Regions:
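Transmembrane alpha-helices and adjacent helix-loop boundaries
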Residues: 1-456
Length: 456
C-alpha cells in the first residue's frame, strides 16, 4: 500500500478535479472530459509501450489513430449498393493486384540475396502495379464518387456493429506499423521521428483525398452507436421514472403540476445526455483497465525486462543473443495497434469521421506531452498524464477567464487591455501547456509518476 501511495494520491486529486467540474460547471462537461481522458489514456499507453519500454520515437501516432477511425467507418456504415454496382468490381480487382504485388515482393526478398537486381525488381513491381491500378480503377473511382455525392459518394462499409471496429482498427494500425517498422526502424532516432511523422501525414492525405473509400473532407456522419440515443431515452418510461426518482427532492419543492412536469421534462433531457456519457465511460473504462492489466503484466515479465535491457543498452542486449530488430518491430506494432483502438473509440463516441480534424498538434505532440508529464516507462504515469494534460487542455479557457477577471477587476469591460486578453483566451491553452511542460521538465524530469524498476 505504501509504495502505491503516490499513485493513489495523484489519481484521487485528478478525480477530485473532474468532480469539481461537475459541481461548478455541469456533469455533462465533467463526463465529456472524463471520456476524452480515457481515450487519451489509451493513446498514451500505446505511446508509452513504444517509448517507455523500448525507447522508440514514434511521431506518427496521428496516422494510426486515423486508421482506427477509418475502421469505424468501414465496419459500421451500410454498404452503398449503387456505388458497388458502379465500380466495386474494379476496386476489388485492384485490391487483388495489391495482394499479388505483396507476394511477389516477398518472393524476391526471400529467394534473392540483397543486390541491385532485387532492388530494381521490387521497384519495377511497385511502379508497374501503381500504373496498372491507376489506369484500370480511375474510371470506376469517378463513377463511385458520382453516386449521390451529397450523402454517399463512397462504397460504404460492412454494416456491422461499430464495436467490432475497435479490434479491426488495431489490426489496421498494426498492419501499417509492420510496413513502417520493416522500413524505418533501422534508422537513427531523429530520422525515425521524422520518418514516422511524414508517413502519418501521407496516411492522412490519402484518407482526405480518396473519397471513394472515406468520403474525404466531406466527412461521414451518423455512425452507429453502441449506446442508446438520447432522444430514445427521453421517451422510455423506465428512464423517466428513474430521473423522477433520482430528482424527487427537487420535484417535491414544486407545487404546480404544470411546472413540475416542465421541470421533469428538462431533467429528462439533461439526464439522457448524462446517461449516454456514463455508458461510454463504462465501455472506455473496461478498455483502459484491460490494457493496464495486460501492460503491467508484460512490463514485469521476463519479456518486459528484456525490452528495458534493449532500451538501456542495445549493444549489450544484442551481444547476449537477443534479436533486437525483431523485438523493436514487435513493440512498434503493439503500441501502434493500441493507438488504433483509441482512434476507433474516438470516432465511436463522436459518431462521425472527419479526416480534416487530424492534426499533429492534437493527435501526436499532445499525446507525447501526456507521456512526458505523466512519466514514461510507468503505465500509471502515462495514464495520469493523459488525464492531467487533457483536463488542462479543456479547462484552460475557464481558468484563463477566471484569471483575467481576477487581475483586471478594476478595469472597465471596454478597456482595450481587458478586451485584448479576453480575445486571446483560446491561445492560453498553448501557454499553459508550455509552462506545465517546462515546470515538469525542470522539477520532475522523469514525470509525475516516474518509472520504478522492481527487482524480484
Amino acid at each position: 500500500m505504501r509504495k502505491h501511495l503516490n499513485v493513489i494520491i495523484a489519481y484521487t486529486i485528478m478525480l477530485g478535479l473532474i468532480i469539481l467540474v461537475g459541481i461548478f460547471q455541469s456533469w455533462n462537461v465533467a463526463l465529456s472530459i472524463f471520456n476524452m481522458c480515457l481515450i487519451s489514456a489509451v493513446m498514451t499507453i500505446g505511446a508509452n509501450i513504444q517509448w517507455g519500454y523500448a525507447g522508440l520515437i514514434n511521431f506518427g501516432l496521428m496516422g494510426y489513430a486515423a486508421l482506427g477511425g477509418l475502421a469505424a467507418v468501414l465496419i459500421s456504415v451500410e454498404p452503398v449498393q449503387e456505388a458497388w454496382v458502379a465500380g466495386g468490381f474494379s476496386i476489388l480487382m485492384s485490391l487483388w493486384l495489391i495482394v499479388v504485388m505483396v507476394f511477389a515482393i516477398r518472393f524476391l526478398l526471400k529467394n534473392f540475396e540483397k543486390s541491385k537486381i532485387r532492388t530494381y525488381g521490387i521497384a519495377a513491381i511497385i511502379i508497374t502495379g501503381i500504373i496498372i491500378i491507376r489506369v484500370t480503377s480511375e474510371t470506376s473511382i469517378e463513377a463511385i464518387e458520382n453516386v449521390n455525392p451529397a450523402t454517399t459518394g463512397f462504397l460504404g462499409g460492412l454494416g456491422l456493429p461499430i464495436m467490432f471496429s475497435w479490434i479491426v482498427g488495431a489490426f489496421f494500425a498494426a498492419g501499417l506499423a509492420f510496413i513502417v517498422g520493416k522500413v524505418a526502424l533501422g534508422l537513427r532516432a531523429d530520422y525515425l521521428a521524422i520518418a514516422t511523422l511524414l508517413i502519418s501525414e501521407i496516411v492522412i492525405a490519402i484518407i482526405k483525398h480518396e473519397d471513394w473509400l472515406t468520403r474525404g473532407v466531406k466527412n461521414v456522419i451518423g455512425l452507429d452507436r453502441p449506446v442508446p440515443y438520447e432522444i430514445e431515452l427521453q421517451t422510455k418510461e423506465w428512464f423517466i421514472n428513474l430521473v423522477a426518482k433520482f430528482n424527487s427532492g427537487k420535484l417535491d419543492l414544486i407545487s404546480s403540476i404544470t411546472d413540475k412536469q416542465a421541470a421533469l421534462n428538462q431533467l429528462v433531457i439533461e439526464g439522457s445526455s448524462v446517461f449516454v456519457k456514463l455508458c461510454y465511460s463504462g465501455l472506455f473504462l473496461i478498455v483502459v483497465i484491460a490494457l493496464l492489466i495486460v501492460t503491467q503484466k508484460a512490463l514485469y515479465s521476463p519479456w518486459g525486462r528484456m525490452m528495458r535491457a534493449i532500451r538501456d543498452n542495445e549493444e549489450a542486449a544484442n551481444a547476449m543473443g537477443k534479436n533486437v530488430a525483431k523485438q523493436h518491430l514487435l513493440i512498434f506494432i503493439l503500441g501502434s495497434a493500441i493507438v488504433g483502438i483509441a482512434g476507433a473509440m474516438l470516432v465511436t463516441q463522436d459518431g462521425l469521421f472527419t479526416p480534416g480534424s487530424y492534426q499533429p498538434m492534437r493527435y501526436t505532440f499532445l499525446i507525447w506531452v501526456m507521456v512526458i508529464v505523466g512519466g514514461s516507462g510507468n503505465n500509471f504515469g502515462a495514464i495520469l498524464g493523459g488525464f492531467a494534460v487533457w483536463f488542462l487542455w479543456i479547462e484552460a479557457a475557464p481558468i484563463a477567464f477566471f484569471l483575467i477577471n481576477l487581475f483586471t477587476v478594476g478595469l472597465a469591460d471596454t478597456h482595450s487591455l481587458k478586451i485584448h486578453l479576453i480575445e486571446s483566451v483560446p491561445y492560453f491553452r498553448y501557454l499553459m501547456m508550455g509552462m506545465g511542460l517546462l515546470l515538469i521538465m525542470r522539477y520532475r524530469p522523469k514525470g509525475i509518476l516516474p518509472e520504478k524498476i522492481e527487482i524480484k
